[in-house]
């Protein structure tokens, strides 16, 4: 499973959509699990039969093998410190410069 932390923004949505279209199972992560769920529902309309879910960032990170950071750099340190344990052994990809 691929997780997109901060996945409700344009970068996360775009990457999640494309990878879901390619057949990957994805989870949209957000500070607000309800918001992540709504984005996942929106993306599912574009990917019939897709495997897209929404979750809080911590849950998304725990469930995924590969985690994409798709939120502003300024907030990354704080979130990564909170998610140290769920990220152990994961591939973490920062898509924000």
PLM-predicted stretches and their roles:
Residues 1-42:
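NAD(P)+-binding Rossmann beta1-loop-alpha1 motif at the extreme N-terminus of oxidoreductases
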Residues 93-97:
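Glycine-/Pro-rich loop/turn segments that contact NAD(P) or position catalytic residues
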